[in-house]
Amino acid sequence: MSSALPDVSVTDLTHSLSPLQWVGMQGIDLPVRIEEPTYQRELHARADVQVDLPAPHVKGIHMSRLYCLLDAWGQAAAVSPASLFALLQEMIDSHQDCGSRNARLRLDFDLLVRRPALVTEGLSGWKSYSVHVLATKVGGALNLSIEVRIGYSSTCPCSAALSRQLIEDGFLRTFKDQPLLEASAVAQWLRSNASLATPHSQRSEARVRVTVPSDAPDLGLLALIDQVEGALRTPVQTAVKRADEQAFAALNGQNLMFVEDAARRIQASLRGYRDSQVHVRHLESLHPHDASAWSAPQASAPDQQESFATGNER
């Protein structure tokens, strides 16, 4: 019995002599460490790793090599631009016999962050943010982008104005024959009738993608999330009591916004980031469809905006 195991990727020649842009694996389970100034945690991620296969005579790549490199990287290093780019180079170096010159890595994970209640001291809860990291080395050029998804509440300005008009009409009908009003009477009427009409609001989602500088010490995930939530001012909450719910209602009333307003707010907050792209979606409670808006500093790249807008990625 022969001790040598067959390797058809080496011994079998391909019948179609054509290069392949990317070959590799998707959805590899992996623990990753995120280490940022205000956040340190090990998380469960799913990874995609690929290299190019430019040599048409080579039947296939060595997927086990990519897997082992990824596995060792996940155990040894925190996720950072430096560690990601080092892994990409190792992936390319491991496939010199395939002529590989390019590599890419994608990580998908949820960043779990503890958030305090708006008002109640000592009350907090966990909030999850979906994160996508894409690192590439193509033609010698390194590129790293991060994408985060952030939930927030949006209240329609038009609906708020229509609601205020109905409340105003109700007030005038009630007090039209009373030229002098006591504050207590007005307050009592408002307690019973201020919700005569209410504006529609809904849970909404922002997707934000930015390029991370290659010399950055970390990905800056929490800093980006905090920046966007600060611009929107109505991020969805975790643990709440009545005082927190009231404070949240006040924030929504003070920050009425169309989907266009939300996209512009976020884009304005990203001026310090390179190549930022924004997609916001309001899951309308008035309609069975969503309202959406997209924003990017350079509107001259519609192909990139379209790929970002499809939302078909895992």
Curated annotation (Swiss-Prot):
It is an enzyme of class 3 (hydrolase). InterPro entries: GTP_cyclohydrolase_FolE2, GTP_cyclohydrolase_FolE2/MptA. GO terms for molecular function: GTP cyclohydrolase I activity. Pfam families: GCHY-1. Keywords: Hydrolase. PANTHER family: GTP CYCLOHYDROLASE MPTA. Belongs to the GTP cyclohydrolase IV family. This is GTP cyclohydrolase FolE2. The gene is folE2.
